[in-house]
Amino acid sequence: MGSVRWKTHQQWLIIFWILSFSGVFGFSELWFSIEPQDVSVSAGQHVVLDCQAGGESPVSVRWRENGVQIQESECVRLLSNGSLCVSNLTQQRDEGYYQCVANNQYGAIISHRARLTITGVLVFSAHPVPLELRLGSVARFSCAVNRSPADISWEINQRSLPQDSDRITVLPNGVLQIRNVTMRDAGKYRCVAANAASRVTSREAELVLIPVGGPRRLLKPLIIAGPQNISVALHQPVVLECLAEGNPRPLVSWSRADSKPIDVSAASVLGNGNLMISAVKAHHSGTYVCRATTPGTRNYTTAAGNVTVLPPSLVEKPESQTRPRAGTARFSCQAEGTPTPQITWFKNGEVIRTNGRTKMYNNKLVITQIIPEDDAFYQCLAENSQGSVVSTSRLIVVQSENRPSAPRNIHAETISSSAILLAWERPQYNADKVIAYSIHYMKSEGLNNEEYQAVIGNDTTSHIVDDLEPARNYTFYIVAYMAMGASRMSEQVTRHTLEDVPLRTPELSLTSRSPTDILVSWQPLPPKLSRGRVSAYRLSYRTATDEQVNSVELPVSGENGTQYLLQDLQPDTIYLIRMSVSTRVGWSQPSAWSSHRTPKTSSATVPPAPNLELEPLNCTSVSVRWFPAASDVLIQGFKLSFHPDGQSEDSITQLPPQDHQHTITALNPRVKYHVKVLAFSANGDGYQAHQTVNTPGCPSTPNRRLAALPPPDHTHAKANSSSAVHLSWGRPAFSSGKPVTFSVRYGPASPSEASSVRYIQTSEQTVMVTGLQPNTRYEFAVRLHMDQMSSPWSATVYQRTLLEAPMSPPESVKVTLIEADTALVCWKQPNQPNLSVTHYTVLYASQSSWLAGEWQVLQREGTNTMALLEKLESGNVYLVKISASNLAGDGPFSNTVELAVKGKPHHGKNPRHADSHAEKTAFIDGLYHIDEKSMSGIIVGVCIALSCIILCIFILLSKTQTQKSASSKMIGSMRNEVMHNEASSANQQPAENAEVLLPMMRNHFIDAKGGSNLLINHAGPINCGSQTKRKRWSIFNHSQRSNESKNETEDPACLYEVGKTVLCYEDEA
């Protein structure tokens, strides 16, 4: 055994020794000796782009233009040395980036890109502008063309501008500088640009000079045009402008901001202070400072410009590697430059697309599960506007001769929406050396799909992959492993998982076009969430105050399949809307209710709802964009608000009318938010656009399969009693043998009771939630926990607990006699939370009937807490008791209350009344029912009383003047004397009469039959007694007071006899 191991090690050493001497690690199989360079040629001419490659023969060369392979033609010929000749050049056809590709038996490599520029017709992108200056000033004109190179010159008055004076300087970039202008410099200037294809002139700009009287005043130095920040390619010229004026003429000097000396070998001064570098190199990069100083003084001014000479360069190059089958290769490539270079990876001259085994992270290329086909050239291309650079490396895959053959006869069978069974046969060769199998699978559709791997032992030839997404095609292959390496991969098989119910519903967008409609729109679910082909949508809606839900089912159609208009709605009403989604397997859980208030009905024209778009930028911010709908209304601004699902709205953000975008920050990850936007005008707020968005989760550990657990599904709640609800749910399908637990969240559905939320922890998939309030609507949600991770909450379900029979009797039972044979009984609802009463039962009977068990029964609706007991017999004592009932049963009766009904009316006594608390006087709040007979009597009595009052007032006023002298006499027994004295008293005290008579007219209903101090108005019975001192008028029937003493001892309120009328006034406490 030891000799075998030593022999194997010797084989590996020999392989590495041979490879090193063959130049593999030195990389000598293929290279470029000459690469194409940037070139500019006139249209109609020809150009030769050079390219020569070396390596192991045979080596062939081909060319690409803008990434597309070039085919030879009459104008395009491939020369024998690999160069490319292009004749009869045209800008539209031939201008672009060229690249040569060399290949041999080991693979292919590409060169860097060379730009071919065709000089065409020039067009001015900037024209000179007119100037008006004083004599002796500095003039500056500039122009620019759309392409370079171009020769630029200047003309004055359509003649060439003489440049024999050092006052005039023309820069290569098209700038004309004239120092110390004189009258002969006045005129019209224009710019002339020329190349091999055209010659063009700019618009004219006139220079107007203003004469100056007397000597020029002293001026501090001023830089009119300073250096600009510029990026320049290697070996190209660059000019840094510095034009200054002042009196006396300032001196211009240059320096570097980093205090390094300026390279004078390539730099020179152009004109009066402009710095020119003829051929830029990398060390010329830096910040250059122009300084204008007044001679002999310390007065100066400066201007700075940055020169960037940083073409792409590689600071870390990929290295060639040798790896065994099923190993992992990593290539690194880091580049720098300005602008920042973009890195592209190539394999054998073709751009690499990431897939299951090939990934790119931070400009690094990683290849896992290496197969023989990965043996190739790998290149890193760094490119920006200043150029490109390429680095080449090689991956060599070493294979063992004794490796097993690939597994055979791969077969896949679908088990469910998330599981597929794989079966295979052992390798045909060296099957006894297999120690394990590796199953590789990935999604078949799309790009950049991640490849997953499952390793199993060699004792089985089947495996269930149960962590798949529903309704997806998956591709599988298997690799057999032995101690020395891996087999070739097996044939690939593709299998489709079954559909499932959708994982969630789309986000809804709600807008109103009128006060009576709501437009509901949504985006189609992505395949990961739909878990199959969506067949229908179910839209449910109701008002916030009504629990009756209306639903409409919408089959999926090609057109307008993602919106629906709810019509015939109520204006200014809050509607709750939710959605369910269906595949052919079944319906998803409905979404949470989304609220939307329909607009008010108004004759004023307000802005329509804008079109709203929401896009999560990251886990804590969302981009909000809106587009105002076409309207004639002048928009004065926008209002934006947002809030998490289930919470009240935050403050409103007001935005100006020109803003159509806003970013909401500081959000929580994995939370559903409601966003609302409306436009407002002078007529008020417009229609509102409402949409929801879910923030994604923040990035966590990469390559973690369970980055987020799915929530429990199929949550179902059923009321078990008045205080308990049975809750059940399903565990989501995912492959993990780890134990899971669940959290149940429940609480009243009313937002005002949000603080009453409770939680239950359980490891089962069902729980009995107890301790609930009867007849209360509760909401329930469940989440899953596993390995210190938690899923989102499941969709909320709602359930109302059952009714509970009344447990206590009605309270505050009171009985009051309001007529000789009629009593009023009132009560309060039993003191029991959330109690629903359907009806009340009133039992009453006289004592004799009670002993005989003969009760009379009255029933009143649950909203009524009063009843009239009629046809009571005088001289009896009645017993009364009440109970409450609902659909769940009857409650207990209250304590018995007695009511004594007198046989004869008596003087000065109130009617007999009683209650459960033995109170002397009963105040009855609210309305009670009066039958038609009693109401007719009350109306007749009120009419008689009002007639008497009007007659009395008329008599009092008519007798005032004639009865003054008799005002001091006592009241006589005759009716005319009584009326005479009443008129005399009214004459003496007219103000009191007015004050006292008015209250009598305020009572709507007065019992004219007498016998009670109980008044009945539109609100019910009113007790006339009071503990405060007040004035009172009383009208009673009486023949005559016999003497003064009797009048003092009797209560005027109780003097009631038929046949006589007495009008009394007094103060009482």
UniProtKB/Swiss-Prot annotation:
Keyword Phosphoprotein carried by entry: no
GO BP terms, alphabetized: cell-cell adhesion
Q: Where in the cell is it found?
A: Membrane
Question: In what residue span(s) does the Ig-like domain sit?
Answer: 30-117, 122-208, 221-308, 312-396
Signal peptide start-end = 1-26
Q: Which stretches face the Extracellular side?
A: 27-936
Disulfide bridge positions per record: 51-100, 143-191, 242-290, 333-380
| Record keyword Chaperone present | no
As recorded in UniProt, coiled-coil segments are none
Q: How does it sit in the membrane?
A: Single-pass membrane protein
The residues that the database entry marks as glycosylated are 81, 88, 180, 229, 299, 306, 458, 473, 560, 618, 720, 834
Q: Which segments cross the bilayer?
A: 937-957
Residue ranges occupied by any Fibronectin type-III domain in the UniProt entry:
406-500, 502-601, 608-701, 711-804, 809-904
Entry keyword set: Developmental protein, Disulfide bond, Glycoprotein, Immunoglobulin domain, Membrane, Repeat, Signal, Transmembrane, Transmembrane helix
User: What domain of life does the UniProt record list for this protein's source?
Assistant: Eukaryota
> Which stretches are Cytoplasmic in the membrane topology?
958-1069
Region named Disordered? 317-336, 590-609
Q: Which PROSITE patterns match?
A: FN3, IG_LIKE
Q: Which GO terms describe its cellular component?
A: membrane
Where, by tissue, is this protein expressed? Initially expressed in the ventral forebrain and ventral spinal cord. Later, also expressed in the midbrain and in parts of the diencephalon and hindbrain.
Chain intervals with Polar residues compositional bias: 590-605
Q: What does this protein do?
A: May play a role in anteroposterior axis elongation.
The text of the family note is: Belongs to the immunoglobulin superfamily. DCC family.
Name by which UniProt lists this protein:
Protogenin B
- What's the name of its gene? prtgb
